[in-house]
Regions:
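Active-site phosphate-binding/coordination module
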Residues: 27-118
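Short helix N-cap motif at coil->helix boundaries in the Bergerat
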Residues: 23
Length: 126
């Protein structure tokens, strides 16, 4: 069985960061970095796709020297530095309001203990 036609080449490839480009200790694999750079040199767009926030993903994107867009917050934010604004696919406002209600209704819950990452744009987790 032939999976791909002869001469076929992808236009875009996406890679997760944690556990794919990094090891179990979150150390970046420099062989993986070199492979991503070779893909882009060959004209294949590389997308970083991760659950990390945009600021973290952008830092790695710059370090590697990529040109493709980034997909972060588990698909909640799509962005490229050349775009005027990121595409935010979810707001997280309902979860934030639920957390505030929970803190008001249950005095044993410290509202200061219900937080999320300050860099999150599309998710708000309890």
């Amino acid at each position: 069985m032939e999976w791909l036609p002869p001469g076929w080449c992808p236009k875009v490839v996406a890679f997760d960061i944690d556990g794919t480009l990094t090891d179990e200790n979150k150390l970046l694999d420099m062989h993986a970095v070199e492979a991503l750079r070779r893909l882009e040199t060959a004209g294949i767009t590389v997308v970083l796709a991760t659950g990390n926030v945009r600021a973290i993903t952008y830092g790695l994107w710059r370090f590697i020297g990529l040109k493709g867009p980034i997909c972060c917050e588990n698909g909640g934010v799509l962005w490229h530095p050349s775009w005027p604004e990121p595409i935010v696919r979810a707001s997280g406002q309902e979860a934030k309001q639920a957390a505030q209600w929970l803190a008001e209704e249950h005095q044993e819950i410290d509202p200061n203990g219900i937080t999320t990452n300050a860099w999150r744009e599309s998710e708000w987790c309890l």
